[in-house]
């Protein structure tokens, strides 16, 4: 499992808001999109990003600013987990992504 200095977790309402927040995080910070989860019939979206502590913190701060302005009441939570435990990374990085990466290695 790949390691990251930090993992950012964002919970927001509505898919379109999640996509916009993810786009802003990826454009503004050197973070990698790790995975998404949907609950409540797709109404609640959880995004996971990884990278250095400073870059993940920057991405999460940007999302919080969006949540206080344009998307007030849509952002439910946004946190940074510094130095995540390896078990957290196993959960965050889905087995599907690991399988896809291994398939790419075999095919290349």
What are these regions (language model features)?
Residues 1-44, 50-108:
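Long, contiguous binding/interaction regions
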């Amino acid at each position: 499992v790949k390691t990251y200095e930090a993992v950012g977790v964002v919970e927001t309402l509505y898919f379109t808001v999640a996509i916009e927040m993810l786009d802003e995080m990826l454009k503004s910070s050197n973070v990698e999109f790790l995975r998404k989860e949907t609950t409540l019939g797709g109404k609640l979206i959880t995004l996971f990003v990884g990278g250095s502590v400073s870059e993940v913190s920057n991405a999460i701060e940007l999302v919080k600013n969006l949540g206080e302005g344009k998307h007030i009441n849509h952002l439910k939570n946004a946190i940074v987990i510094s130095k995540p435990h390896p078990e957290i990374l196993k959960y965050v990085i889905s087995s599907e992504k690991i399988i896809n990466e291994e398939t790419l290695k075999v095919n290349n």
